[in-house]
Amino acid sequence: MYLVVGLGNPGKQYEATRHNMGFDTIDSLVEDYNVPQGGVKFNAMYGKTMIGGEKVILMKPLSFMNLSGGPVREMANYFKIDPESELIVIYDDIDLEPGQLRIRKQGSAGGHNGIKDIIRQLGTEKFLRIKVGVGAKPKGWDLADHVLGRFSTEDRKLVDEAIAKAAKAVDIIITQGTDAAMNEYNRKVPVQK
């Protein structure tokens, strides 16, 4: 069984913002696999599906980004998920250009407060991450204003493609393994603007 978590902030005012790449990817998976809404548990929306014969729980924490760890820990404990082999977390990354994707098996939070809280709550940095590039903040901008802002039309197109790739990466991780997904998506591919 896998727990696939998309990070974001709940509420209409945060829809389509840079910080909601995880939510957007979960929405894409829900659509791709026609996942019925499972309800709310542990301050998170979730649904269950099957991918490649594996049970998969798709989850969007309803806490704000910086408090994502509690709902993730509670859901993982409830479904007896091993974070090191059965947890996939999808989130935005300002160190990647819009449209780029990176898959990592473990690592630090890299300044991402949602990941920092998950690491704190789980007590480990060893869990799989899919990072969706949203681009660096412009000089002089506040980081919060940047990640809570919306994309230009040009960047939105690139990010929508990256969200589709992130959803496909989840499928590949589950059906073919993490290394296959990393080989497919961690290549340095120039982003066409």
Where do the language-model regions lie?
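Nucleotide and nucleotide-moiety/phosphate-recognizing core
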Residues: 2-106, 116-120, 124-130, 137-142, ...
